[in-house]
Amino acid sequence: MKHLIPLIVMASVVLAVYADRGYGGGRRGGGYGGGGYGGGGGGYGGGGGGYGGGVGGGRGGGGGLGGGRGGGGGVIDGKDDVGLGGGGYGGGLGGGQGGGGGLGGGQGGGGGLGGGRGGGGYGGGGGGYGGGKYGGGKYGRK
């Protein structure tokens, strides 16, 4: 069992590197804040983002130690389109899913260190390390 821990950590780091190269993801949406109008959450070493990014959201990327994802959603044509966008997917250690839909998009994924619920306000979902109350909303990156 002790031999598996380094392998898991190494695999998580690799996932984080690939996620950082994803569609608008990586550290731009990572850390404590969620992502703008439907962007991805972060996570400790994780990569977020979303295919749609910005307006309309899209799906968030996963991966990394303490991962967990922010969701989509956002504003389309100046309206609060609840239900559009959608959740992301987890990956690595402490995965989880982000919520989507509408202005401020649903809830962030739990799991990882300091997980819990993100989302709220204009931000996307939180999750992973430093998630929870810091995921999106007031602390979300615009």
From Swiss-Prot:
It comes from the Eukaryota. It is found in: Secreted. The modification Tyrosine amide is found at Y139. Its main location: secreted. GO terms for cellular component: extracellular region. One of its GO terms (biological process) is innate immune response. Expressed in hemocytes (at protein level). Residues 1-19 form the signal peptide. Keywords: Amidation, Antibiotic, Antimicrobial, Immunity, Innate immunity, Secreted, Signal. Belongs to the glycine-rich peptide family. Antimicrobial protein with bacteriostatic activity against the Gram-negative bacterium E.coli, and very weak activity against the Gram-positive bacterium S.aureus. Lacks activity against the yeast C.albicans. This is Ctenidin-3. It comes from Cupiennius salei. The lineage of its organism: Eukaryota, Metazoa, Ecdysozoa, Arthropoda, Chelicerata.
